[in-house]
C-alpha cells in the first residue's frame, strides 16, 4: 500500500477494532475531514495513521492529534510545548484535555506524547463531541 487515505483507514479500522472503537475512529476521521486544515495520512503497511493539522500563520502546521487503525490516539501536547511559544494556548489545550479525560497532562506527568487506547478515553458520543469542540477551540486560537 502506497499511502493511507480516508476510505482505507476506515476500512482497516472496521476490520481491526471492535465496532464501538471503530465508530469512535470514524467519527474522529469525519471530524478531521470536515475541520482540519490538512490531514496527513501515514504510509505504513500494517497500521494506518492519520494526523489532524491546523495551519497557523505564526507557528506553521501544528499537529493536534494522531489516530491509528489499531484504535489509538495521541495528543500532540508536548509537540506544542516545544513549537508554540504562546504558552497560554498550550496551557488551554492541557486544561481542556485534563477536563475531558480526567488525566494529568502536566510536563512532569506527561513528558512525551503517548498513544492512548481510544476506548479508555471515549465511552459515549458526548465525550467525542467534547473533544472535537476542544480541537476546534485550539485551532481557532492558533489562527488568531
What function would you assign to each model-found segment?
Residues 1-116:
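Polyanion-binding interface signature
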